[in-house]
Structure formats: C-alpha cells, structure tokens
Amino acid sequence: MKIYDISQEVFGCEVYPGDPAPEKKVLKSMQNGEVYNLTAFSMCAHNGTHIDAPFHFIKDGKTVDALCLEAFVGMAYVAEHHGVVTYNDATEIIEKAKEQNPEAAKRILLKGDVEVSLEAAKIFASSDILLLGNEP
C-alpha cells in the first residue's frame, strides 16, 4: 500500500479567521552558547493538519484521546468536491466509494474547498465509515 502524506505545513497554511496564528520561540540555542537547543511552540488546535473529534460538534462526543487510532490508518477513498456537500452528495460519495473499493470506503477524504451540510454530516455519521476527512 502506498502512503500519501497530506499534512499541511503548520507555518505556511491558512489560519481560520479569528484563530491565533502559530508561533515558535527559541528558548535555548547552542549557537548562543547553551548546551542544547529548545524551542517553544504554540498554535490553535484547528491550525494545520488536525483531527476534529466528535466532541468538537457533539456535546457528549468523544474527545481525541478516546478515538481509536486504527481508524486513521489504511486505504481511503478520495472524492473531489467543491462547495457544500449536500445529503445527496454524501449518499453518492458513499455509494461510489463502496462500488470502487469497499475497504477504501471505510475512510473517505473530501478533496477540495468543502463545507459539509448538517444533512450530509448525518449521512456520513450514520454510515459504516470510520473516518471522514477534508484535504483542501
């Protein structure tokens, strides 16, 4: 299986409006005579490549530490889409994924600038997929 790195560079990717930009600060530097290098790093949890756990949108949803890591590793179906993903779009994406490769259909990546509608989110959540991701 070929593995694709779709992670975004933290300091080069777009920051969600209203969120603080990531920052890094050199605390210790061997170049300045210290015995080691040390850097402090801060960022909003929604910057760069990240996971939105169910808790992000569901009051009693699971937090990131409670998620099963196996859901994040494996074959995935990539569906290119731009704009709002509707109920019908979600249904069609799931059907096409299952037709093309049932194993890959367990993890669906939406490629493009998308917004998942509430109706589409419910379809994805009620299906048997393990992961829904967005890669711009």
Question: What are these model-predicted stretches?
Answer:
Residues 1-136:
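Active-/binding-site microenvironments in catalytic and ligand-binding cores
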